[in-house]
Amino acid sequence: MSKEVLNQTKEKMEKAVQAYGRELATVRAGRANASLLDKVTVDYYGAQTPLNQIASITVPEARMLIITPYDKTAIGDIEKSIQKSDLGITPTSDGNVIRIAIPALTEERRKELVKVVRKYSEEAKVAVRNVRRDANDELKKLEKNGEITEDELRSSTEDVQKLTDEYVAKIDDVMKDKEKEIMEV
């Protein structure tokens, strides 16, 4: 029974780290990347629609994104949504496609982005710790119901802590890599 709890815990912690990775992909690091626009939603016929559902996003060169809307009438709304996002990028349109030149990051902007990365890292660590708390509560419940012994509880709790340490270390490694990528000129 405690093995089942450990497996569920590992799975949930893995999902938390994957969600953190997706979150970091939206942080701009000076290079064009279609995932920068993943969080951008457009008011499309009255509904907030993810940009990647109403347009194709391509990366023709290292510092350029091209957005080709499937519906040309949405160009104005797409431009507004990108400007409102906190990405610090300005779209230009020729009526058919929207081009976004990704400017080189200033030192100040790099430091802001590092703070954002650290905030996301802390949120991911909190998520992992919440999974640990839930697992420990579940194990205590099993012990209280007599399904596992006190020794099994102690052993399983230690295993959960090892998993927590492992996933927190993964988050730290990913954070350091992203910070290095951002601070690279």
UniProtKB/Swiss-Prot annotation:
Please tell me whether the keyword Protein biosynthesis is annotated for this protein: yes
CDD domains xrefs:
RRF
One short Pfam name that applies is RRF
For this entry, list what GO says about its biological process. Answer: translational termination
InterPro entries this protein is in? Ribosome_recyc_fac, Ribosome_recyc_fac_dom, RRF_sf
Q: Could you name the domain of life of the organism this protein comes from?
A: Bacteria
Main location per the UniProt record: cytoplasm
Q: Could you state a single Gene Ontology molecular function term?
A: ribosomal large subunit binding
Per UniProt, subcellular location reads as: Cytoplasm
Asked whether the UniProt record includes Lipid metabolism among its keywords, one would answer: no
Which UniProt keywords are present, listed alphabetically? Cytoplasm, Protein biosynthesis
Which Gene Ontology cellular component annotation is one that this UniProt entry carries?
cytoplasm
Functional summary from the UniProt entry:
Responsible for the release of ribosomes from messenger RNA at the termination of protein biosynthesis. May increase the efficiency of translation by recycling ribosomes from one round of translation to another.
The family database entries (NCBIfam families) matched by this protein are listed as: frr
Q: Which family is this protein grouped under?
A: Belongs to the RRF family.
Recorded protein name is Ribosome-recycling factor
Q: Which organism is it from?
A: Bacillus pumilus (strain SAFR-032)
Question: Gene encoding this chain?
Answer: frr
